[in-house]
Structure formats: C-alpha cells, structure tokens
Amino acid sequence: NPNLLPEEQTPVIDLAKTLSPTQKKSLEENLNNLEMQSGWKIKYLSQFESVPGIAIKNYWDLDETSLLVIADPRGGNLLNFNVGDAYFSFLPRLFWVELQTRYGNQYYVREHGEDGAVLDAINSVKICLEKGGCQVVPGLPKEQYLWTLSTSILGGLIAGFSAAPR
C-alpha cells in the first residue's frame, strides 16, 4: 500500500510505532549523517498489519549501497534485512545471520524492547562500517569469545583423537 509512505523523504518509516518520537528523530539524524558522510544508505521500516510493499524500493531508491532494516513483530524474529551487494565486501553473509539472531530473537527483544533491538542492530552495522568491516557482530564479550574458542578447539581435539585409527 504506497499510501502508507510519507510525503517528505525520511530514512525512518515507523508504521508499528516501535520507536519513541525522540528515538525516531535521533535515528533519522544519524542515518542522514551517515549517508552524507559515507554514501552508505541505511533505511528503517517497521510494519505491522499494513505494509507499503514494493513501493518502498522506489521511495528510497534502494541500490547496492542500501541496507533496509525491517522490524515486523508478527514473525518469530523481529528483524529482517534487505542487504545491498556492496555491503558484502565489508560484512559477510554470516554477519547478517548473526545480527538477526542476536538482536531479533524473542529473548533479546523481551529484555531490551523492540526499540532497543532495532537501535542496537543498526548501531552494530554503523560501527562495522566505520571500522571498514567486521567478520562478526561487535559486542561479543571477550570471555564468551574465549570460552567458545576453547570449547571448539577441545571438541576438535576429542573428535580428532576418537576418529584416529588404532
């Protein structure tokens, strides 16, 4: 339904009212500044019952430098991403899976709210773009990273020894 799109250009269309007016204004300013300074376009759409559909692509002129962040509470995961091809040079496909599962899952949303999940996910992308790319989503505590690394190595050793011929 293209009638849902605002007359004026804005990088934030919050149909589901996920963000407070202050958060929305701040996000609009941040995303506009990011686009002016770097050329990367991040757009945010929250939807609930009515959706603008394919009209959103023309409204925002989405291209290979565009990231569309969609928040839709109707599914199992709050967040979905429509990622322009240029992003994959800096942020691999697994980054987007991790981003969605970390911030869009029901437990994170329950603890931080829909607004927190959306803003944290967008902030993670911005941090990675400013750093020139990321292989994983930033913010994993060092202890958790080391624990995961050590258990993976230990599991590999156990599997290797048990598979070795005797």
Predicted regions and their residues:
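C-terminal single-pass membrane-anchor helix
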Residues: 138-166
